[in-house]
Design a protein with these regions (language model features):
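Short beta-strand elements that form the blades of beta-propeller/WD-repeat-like
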Residues: 10-14, 44-48, 89-93, 133-137
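Trp- and S/T/G-rich repeat-edge/linker motifs of beta-rich repeat architectures
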Residues: 1-2, 6, 10, 16-41, ...
Length: 150
C-alpha cells in the first residue's frame, strides 16, 4: 500500500491488491491497471509493477491535475524497484540497488530517452527527488544524496 502526493495537489494511491486510485478533491477514482509503486511529480505520474516493469501516465507532465491517458510502458532495462518523479527528472533504483536517472525528460518528450546510471551510488533501497537533488535510503538504513546533472 502506498499514497503519493505532489506539490500540484495530485494524490495517487495503491491498495494492498495493487489497485490504483487518484483523489479528485471530492472522491477517489479507480484507475485501470495494477502497480506496486507510484510516484507523482512535475515529471508526471510514473509507476512500477512487481515484476519491475516501468510505466508512464501521459498528459500528467508538469504535475497536471488529471488522470491522464492510458499507461505507457517505458523501457525498464535495467529492471527498477523504486521510482521518483521530480522537476524535469525521474530517478529509479534498479533491482541491483544502483541509482539511475531518465535522460531527456521534458515537455516534448515526457518519457525521456533512456536510463543513465549515476556513478558511485549503489546499495539503494528507496529514493525521492527534489529538483535535481536525490535523497535516498540504502540497504543498511543510511541516508545518501546525489545531484543529478543532465
Amino acid at each position: 500500500m502506498q499514497i503519493e502526493a505532489s506539490e500540484g495537489d495530485n494524490v495517487w494511491a495503491i491498495n494492498r491488491n495493487h489497485d490504483i486510485y487518484r483523489y479528485s478533491g471530492i472522491s477517489w477514482q479507480h484507475i485501470s491497471g495494477k502497480l506496486s509503486q507510484i510516484s507523482s511529480g512535475d515529471a508526471g505520474v510514473w509507476g512500477l509493477t512487481l515484476a519491475g516493469t516501468c510505466y508512464y501516465r501521459p498528459y500528467t507532465y508538469e504535475d497536471y491535475p488529471s488522470t491522464g491517458g492510458n499507461w505507457q510502458v517505458v523501457s525498464s532495462s535495467p529492471q527498477m524497484k523504486w521510482l521518483a518523479s521530480g522537476t524535469g527528472v525521474v530517478v529509479g533504483v534498479a533491482k541491483s540497488g544502483d541509482l539511475y536517472y531518465r535522460s531527456g525528460v521534458n515537455v516534448a518528450s515526457p518519457k525521456g530517452r533512456g536510463w543513465v546510471k549515476v556513478p558511485n551510488v549503489s546499495g539503494m533501497r528507496q529514493v525521492d527527488v527534489f529538483h535535481s537533488m536525490v535523497m535516498g535510503v540504502d540497504t543498511s538504513g543510511r541516508i545518501k544524496y546525489s545531484l543529478i546533472k543532465q
